[in-house]
Amino acid sequence: MKMKSSYKIFMVAAALMAGLTACSVEETLNGVELEQDKVSQISDGAVSGELLVRFDSAVSDILDKAGVTKSGPSAPASRTGVLSVDEILELVEGYQIERVFPVDLRSEEKVRKEGLHLWYVVRFSEDHSVNEVAADLAKLGEVSRVEFNRTLKRASESKAIPLTRSVMAEMAASAKTPAFNDPHLGLQWHYVNNGDLGETKFVAGADVNVEKAWEMCTGDPSVIVAILDEGIDVSHPDLKDNLWVNENEIWRSNEDNDGNGYAGDYHGYNFAAGHGVISTGGRYDTGHGTHVAGVIAAANNNGLGISSIAGGNGSQEGVKLMSCQIFSGSLAGTVLDEVRAIKYAADNGAVVLQCSWGYISGAANPYDWTPQFSTDDQWKNSNVLEFNALDYFVHNAGSPDGVIDGGIIVFAGGNESAPAASYPAAYPDFVSVAATAPDYTPAVYTNYGTGTTISAPGGDQDYYYEYGEGHNAGAMGCVLSTLPYTVTGEDSPLAGYGYMEGTSMACPHVSAVVALGISYATKLRKHFKATELKDMLHETARPIEQFWDFSSLKQYYKFVTDLGEAHLSTMDLRNYKGKMGTGQVDAYAFLSAIAESGTDMTFPNVFVALDGQTVISPSIYFENGAAQTYTVSVENSAVASCEVNGNKLIFKGLAEGQTSASVKAASGESFDFIITVRKGANGNGWL
């Protein structure tokens, strides 16, 4: 296999001290076991001179008064104000400390409720051992957790296969669909599979069943999908119209114009490089993030390139793509970059978190891999900060007054052919995706079994090896999507597109279907809890085992690097029975279920701080809301005011109290609501 494309975070758990599990009660009381529990046992790949520290909540006020709370990437502090901590860190030369999550006033109240404000990154001289400094800090009662800022590593240097005329010549036929005029839609079997793309191994219907779903909805620009991956090619002609735009930022600015802690974050942020410029042209960039983005929201019906699941219909924009870049050329992101990206996505409007990366499955063959986590507790207890960030997205993305309350995280299940999904995918709060081929069979590389919740088309290059030659062999059995021109070159008329495979390509199919469903709920003006949509996604999946031939082995050609050639291999489908999740994701069935569920949305009551303001977009509460104009009446203008600015209602708090108000659309539809103005700040100034 030459181009499998799910990112893995490699690490080796450090062994516990011999006999630690046999510690006596006396030793525990002396703090030996307690100190060990405070420090993550995983230090492999740790960045020198850096630690991630969570302080005890008892010293929160001390940190605030010392000004450390307001520290961030652009202004680290040099003292914590906690004497015992400062005494230790003064010994490690020139240390700096900053909050893991920069202050964003819009979300600070939630951050403090979740305890994320207690996490800090401490930097010190690289001459000192991170393990020794971690052990010293763990002895302090003021410190509740110490973790290492590990480097995230790509599991593979896989390469995409650019679309060429020679690849296209292998196609026996092209799927015909009147849906859109995008010229390569006929090659995207993963959306519309008529069973005739190749002479064999293509089964009609082995797709995401999106063609009928497009008649119901093609996406909505109010729905944002955050892509944690390599960067997205922001200049790609098939993607640029569906990129998320931070309207309060300035493109390529070095200033944090909107005060969210990140300068120049116009289409997202390059967390790996530490600036707002999203990049795709680095030496080790593979085009992975751009490929994922195209599956979700390449512009549909624009007469150009490919189609996507939720990319609009030509007259209406699709869902928006937020680039949260955690890999950038030769720069591999760290755990610090990853968790910042996750929280950033939640705070800036994303409701779907697309994650085509993870650790190695704990059930992976140790001859080929280094197995990692096998249980929920192993992963969660070893990666507390990572879990906290993901949990923040699950519970704080979206809005209780919006279409979706909470966020949905979709992970690739992994490519080790292991009988258990990798983590974090396998954790029950997330969607874990296995990959299938164009005939419904499990892809030869996919993880399956424990922790797997759903399947989706991910391609299967080795299985389609008889189609094509050399590097192009099997390409037509893979997923076709967008690629940066730095990957494909610019000379070919087919440049900007190509094939990849992996559970990391199955993953965005599920993320896109989720986003399409939320878009449809927006159209219907229905409200859902994220858990409700997640359950419906799984309940509406299509059973796939009925299409498997259990009487014979699935044959494929596996490229063996040591031998330099491909060898015939087999897999027994009986081993996969009941282990590919609830079935293959089904866009039409999912949207149909949404139509019959949920609660009708009404304009919410408004809460605004005294001398502050709250901004609400009314369009999601009204039929054809984006095309409407609005008027707002406030009964007591001494308490609050409202300015209508296009599709934004800006409420300002003038005096403490409550007042009745109403909002009316040009169509005549109206809602009554209450505005409450209150002092929302505590003694530290946080809302």
Model segments located where?
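Substrate-binding/access-modulating region of protease and related hydrolase catalytic domains
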Residues: 24-27, 215, 219-221, 230, ...
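Protease zymogen maturation seam
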Residues: 106-121, 135-224, 232-238, 242, ...
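Flexible, small-residue-rich helix->loop connector segments that border functional cores
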Residues: 209, 228-235, 248-260, 274, ...
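Active-site-adjacent substrate-recognition loops and nearby beta-strands
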Residues: 283, 306, 334, 338, ...
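C-terminal subdomain of the subtilisin-like protease fold in secreted/lumenal serine endopeptidases
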Residues: 350-357, 406-407, 521-621, 642-644, ...
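Extracytoplasmic soluble-region selector
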Residues: 595-687
